[in-house]
Amino acid sequence: MTERTLVLLKPDAVKRRLIGRIISRLEDKGLKVVALKFMQMTKDQAENHYSVHRSKPFFKDLVTYITSGPIVAMVLEGPKAIEVVRILAGSTDGSKAQPGTIRGDFSMGIEKNIIHASDSPEAYSHEMPIFFNESEIVEWSYGDEIIY
């Protein structure tokens, strides 16, 4: 089943010049970029995005970190996109993520962990409108569809 997922490349990914390498990994897997934005997340956007963590002790630090520099927001589309991106991203704690995953290769910790990916269709439905209007999602085809 084709589905969509929201992916954020966090400030550490941008500062470390990993944008192209990470997007290449996602596209190489067969995921299609249908929306892409380089932006500075506002405090309101961050608090909304991480609202499920509002009562947790790390919430304030999370908001401060994600707003500390520019991010890349994107919507990816493909079969089982949510599950596929979560597998490619690796464990939330980069020090425990498997080599070959994005976090396993580029992250050493849990706070600065390079990438965010929606963890469910419900999360995508909450997160996507924080960063994109429906009109910014581009419906397009490769022409000759690539089969993976």
Curated annotation (Swiss-Prot):
Q: Which domain of life is it from?
A: Archaea
Which InterPro entries does the UniProt entry name for this protein?
Answer: NDK-like_dom (IPR034907), NDK-like_dom_sf (IPR036850), Nucleoside_diP_kinase (IPR001564), Nucleoside_diP_kinase_AS (IPR023005)
| Coiled coil ranges | none
- Specify whether Cytoplasm is a keyword of the entry: yes
Catalytic machinery residues: H116 (pros-phosphohistidine intermediate)
CC cofactor: Mg(2+)
Gene Ontology CC, one term: cytoplasm
Show the SUPFAM superfamilies listed in the entry: Nucleoside diphosphate kinase, NDK
Under the heading SMART domains, the entry gives:
NDK (SM00562)
Q: Does the keyword Cytoplasm apply?
A: yes
Binding-site residues, ATP: K10, F58, R86, T92, R103, N113
Q: What is its main location?
A: cytoplasm
> Could you say which EC number(s) this protein's record lists?
2.7.4.6
The record, for Gene3D superfamilies, names: Nucleoside diphosphate kinase-like domain
**Which top EC class is named for this enzyme in its record?**
transferase
Which reactions are catalysed by this chain? a 2'-deoxyribonucleoside 5'-diphosphate + ATP = a 2'-deoxyribonucleoside 5'-triphosphate + ADP; a ribonucleoside 5'-diphosphate + ATP = a ribonucleoside 5'-triphosphate + ADP
So what does this one do?
Answer: Major role in the synthesis of nucleoside triphosphates other than ATP. The ATP gamma phosphate is transferred to the NDP beta phosphate via a ping-pong mechanism, using a phosphorylated active-site intermediate.
Name used for this protein in its record: Nucleoside diphosphate kinase
